[in-house]
Amino acid sequence: MDFDLSKEHAAIQSEARRFAVREIIPRIKEEKFKRDLVATMGEIGFFGCAFPMKYGGTEMGFLGHSIVCEEISRADSGLRSLFNLQGMTVPYTIMEWGTDAAKEKYIEDLV
C-alpha cells in the first residue's frame, strides 16, 4: 500500500505550510482574531478542499482538508478550529443533505 501523498496533496501541504510560516506565525503574539488571514485562506482555496469545483471547491477531498488542517494547527490551533468549522460544518451539511437550490445558493459563498 502506498502512503505517499499525491502530487496535488503534496502541493497543498506545501502551500499550507508556507502560509502558516509566512502569515500566521509572525502574527501569533497579536492575541486577537485575524479576520484578514481567514479571508486569505478563503482566497487561496483552503476552505474548499473537500468540495467539488461546481461549488467553488478544489476537489482535494477529506485528505486535502486534513492536510491543510494539520499545517494550520502547527501555527495556531485556534485558527485551525475556525478552519475546520468553517470548512466542514455548514457547507458540508448543505452539500450532503440540502436541496439543490440550497446547494447552489449557499455552498460557494461558504467555501
Predicted regions and their residues:
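Intrinsic disorder at enzyme termini
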Residues: 1-12
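Acidic-residue sensor for enzyme active/binding pockets
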Residues: 8, 15, 23, 70-71
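Glycine-rich flavin
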Residues: 24-111
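Generic hydrophobic secondary-structure packing signal
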Residues: 12, 16, 86-89
